[in-house]
From Swiss-Prot:
Keyword terms: Antenna complex, Phycobilisome
InterPro entries, A to Z: Uncharacterised_16.1kDa
Name used for this protein in its record: Uncharacterized 16.1 kDa protein in cpeY 3'region
Lineage of origin: Bacteria, Bacillati, Cyanobacteriota, Cyanophyceae, Synechococcales
GO cellular component, one term: phycobilisome
Amino acid sequence: MQFFVLSHNLQIHSESVPSFTPSELAEGLSLHSDHINTNALNHPHWMVLVESDLSHQELAREVVNAWKKFRNSLGHSMNHSFIALGGRKDSKATPGSPLQEGYWGVDVVECANPDSFLKSINWDALKASRPVDGVFEVRD
């Protein structure tokens, strides 16, 4: 079983691409995937807990696909890129945090230019500081 704790990094500033509440996002992702279970979170950063029997790479792709289907079903603009950036929590969790040891913290980014965004957060250096099997990037 894989556990993803999702955050949302919306880099598109347009009424045609609105942000989601945690409950909207949890429901929308669940409706658009047969492979995930979701729960909305009450946390300042983390929005949704996702559970699945898929591998972490398969689950990352599934989350991005469900997210895109959800946006499309609402008639939102789709003229931008989606990125899922994940890192496995390999240390003890902070008390009260939904991101537990062994879970994946996943930032789903919606942006106009993925390369520029990844450069702005120094993604290559962040990836290099993690075990190869403890980090992923999925683009669409």
